[in-house]
Amino acid sequence: DVYKRQHFGNVECREGDDKSVFITALDHMVEFEDGKAPVQFLMTSCMDFDGKTVDDFTRSQMWDCQESRDRILEECRYSMLATDFLARGLSSLERANLEMDYLEALAELFPSCEAFFFSGSGKLFEAEEIRGNQIEGPDRFIRYAVNVRFFTIQGSDDMLVDTLGMNTLFLPDLQYHFRGLDPNWIVNHAYNVASYLLTSGNEIDSGETIDGIKDGDMDRSIQWKCQYEDALIQPKRPVLDINTGEYAAGNRE
């Protein structure tokens, strides 16, 4: 009932043989060459969970719940998988909104849920943050499903910021290899650019420029060149590398 009233409109639900639940969102159709079909969502039955399966690399980039991260991963004993089917055929914007509607529905449906983990980006949130969300529209996806990661390069002053999770929507992840800039400025810049790519529907091509940073804010008087490259940090994927001008580090083709 919570799905129908608040989140998906018209739905059909059925239970699988293994107690999984399939939810068909009848108001969200995907068109194919030979017809069309509604988007579906899956909730698996409860499974045992062992926090030790989350590696140190992934843990190191869980910036949104650093104080509670270890407690959650140590104390949680059960998990369930929630995902979508056929949603790849939707526009990036519609899929982002629909997935976040699903997230909010899950937070309501399972009041005893402690946390949400986004396997596509490595983000971990306490469930209460989802329940208290004040963000509307597609920026919910940027907040919860896109991880802006930060790395220092051993043996140098170089730093690297990248995003992980935009590729879920078939949009480019971002990458910045730089030195001499406040990394928090770059993190904010990355979230702003990611939001622009999702909400505007515009593409950024290799060789084009975007507004850079001055005193922590985006500034049109400074232009940073963009180009597509292979990611420097796992997982392997193409990224839109943003050259920070005089603060750029590393070699670019």
Across the structure, where does each feature detected by a protein language model lie?
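Short, intrinsically disordered low-complexity segments
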Residues: 7-70
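Aromatic/basic-lined ligand-recognition segments
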Residues: 118-253
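Conserved short hydrophobic interaction patches
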Residues: 7, 102-109, 193-196, 200
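A short, structural micro-pattern
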Residues: 33-37, 73-76, 110, 234
